[in-house]
Amino acid sequence: MALKVFNWLNRKKHSNVEYCTINENKAMEEKEDSLRASVTEQDTEALLLRDVLINGILAIGTLGHNVNSLCPESCIEQDEPIIMCDEKVEQEKCEEEKAEAKQDTPVTAPSEPASALEPAKMHSSSMKEDNFMCFVKEEILMHGMEVEDVPNIQERPLLMLEKVEKVRTTLADLFAAEAFSSSDAEDKCYPKIVIVAGASTSKPTSCMEKMHHKKPTKPTSKPLKATRKLSRVMRKMLGKKIHPEQLNGRSNAEGPVTA
């Protein structure tokens, strides 16, 4: 409130208004023009403020410019006719150049250079077509490899491995290797024998024979008769002061018999 009062006093003291006589008709026309200008300015400002946020982006410094410059659709619509005009101009230029070239070339000119150039053009075009076809075939093959099923791709390494011959070691190979190694060991164990006149020619025992030589086992005893078994058991019991009936689980009230 204090600022408003201060501004009012400042305007009253420092008034720069110049009074002069003006024709009423001119004043009315100027007033109408100013009103129209203010209305149009307000409308454009409102449109600009409405179009400031295009696609969620705040455009700073665009007030006072053309509204259509803020709309991308209008820009695209303006660019399309320009592009079409450029294309038409280029086509017209090409047609004019072709017509001039036809006029410049004489009708009675020999056709030998043209016929010489035609095979070269045909060869180059055929080479381009072949390259293009090769490229297309490679692309199709690559696409087919990508589209193949996963199980086929997983089975392929297994199939490739089956084609390779595997060398397997069998039991026969192991036994043969063991026999070969044992024969080598026997050859090493045999010392060099020098035959001397009058000496014995008996071969010394090999190392493997000594290793495999077993100690003589004791002869198994013959089975004892029933009477001998019983007598042996009776001796043991009498020596330990045990009655024979106690072995069968019977209890004697009188106690064991002492010898």
UniProtKB/Swiss-Prot annotation:
Keywords: Growth regulation. Residues 96-123, 206-226, 239-259 are annotated as: Disordered. It comes from the Eukaryota. Expressed in the leaf sheath pulvinus, tiller base and tiller node. Disulfide bonds: none annotated. A motif (IGT motif) lies at residues 56-62. Residues 109-119 have a biased composition (Low complexity). One of its GO terms (biological process) is phyllotactic patterning. Involved in the regulation of tiller growth angle. Promotes horizontal shoot growth. TAC1 and LAZY1 play opposite functions in the regulation of tiller growth angle. Plants silencing TAC1 exhibit erect tillers with a very small tiller angle. Belongs to the TAC family. This is Protein TILLER ANGLE CONTROL 1.
